[in-house]
Each structure stands twice: as C-alpha cells, then as structure tokens.
Amino acid sequence: MANHFRTDRVGMEIKREVNEILQKKVRDPRVQGVTITDVQMVGDLSTAKVYYTIMSNLASDNQKAQTGLEKATGTIKRELGRKLTLYKIPDLVFEKDQSIEYGNKIDQMLRALDQKD
C-alpha cells in the first residue's frame, strides 16, 4: 500500500516539474501550448505515462505537439534528473489526454437535451 502512495507522489511531482520545464526550458514552438494534465507511474517507477492537452483541436497541431514532446524528452529527463532525487529517472511516454474532449462532448449532449425541454 505504501508503494501506491509513493507512485502517486512521484507522479504528482513529475507532473509539476514537467509543466515547469515545458514553460521555462523547452524552446520548441510545437510545445508552447501544451499543458500536462496527469502522470501515471508504473509500479516500479521505471515508466511515466504523461498525459497532455493542447488548446487547438486541429489534428495537425496534435501531431506537431506529439512530435515536439518526443523530441524534447531528453531535455525533460535531464532537467528532471537535476530537480528530483530519484535513483533512476523514469522513461517518459507522452499521450494526448482524451478525457477533456470526452467531457466536452458529454457537456454538449446534456445542453442539447436541456434545450429540447
């Protein structure tokens, strides 16, 4: 059970630090509008699945952001190594967060039902 708390704490710390690194250290214009929404850690802390969102809904912008994040992974890991006191910095896997789009779709459906009444 204590290991679960550790993975949650490490995930929260990585989320905070990656957001800061993206804002201050990464100069790639493809990742300027990226916000980290969640980080899920594997139990042994070897891999961190980093969920992100961007303001644009264009598929080309999504692909550019994904490519920019993949290119910046080395810089992000290096900065995490400087800021975190972990034995091994986890491998970062970036995935677009679909939950916000899903929530917006549900919200639109509820509004449409509300307008019918």
UniProtKB/Swiss-Prot annotation:
Entry's localization field: Cytoplasm
This protein's record includes keyword Cytoplasm: yes
Any one GO cellular component localisation term in the record: cytosol
Signal sequence, start to end: none
Alphabetical list of InterPro entries matching this protein: KH_dom-like_a/b, RbfA, RbfA_dom_sf, Ribosome-bd_factorA_CS
Keywords: Cytoplasm, Ribosome biogenesis
Superkingdom, natural source: Bacteria
Subunit structure: Monomer. Binds 30S ribosomal subunits, but not 50S ribosomal subunits or 70S ribosomes.
Sequence similarity: Belongs to the RbfA family.
Protein known as: Ribosome-binding factor A
High-level lineage: Bacteria, Bacillati, Bacillota, Bacilli, Lactobacillales
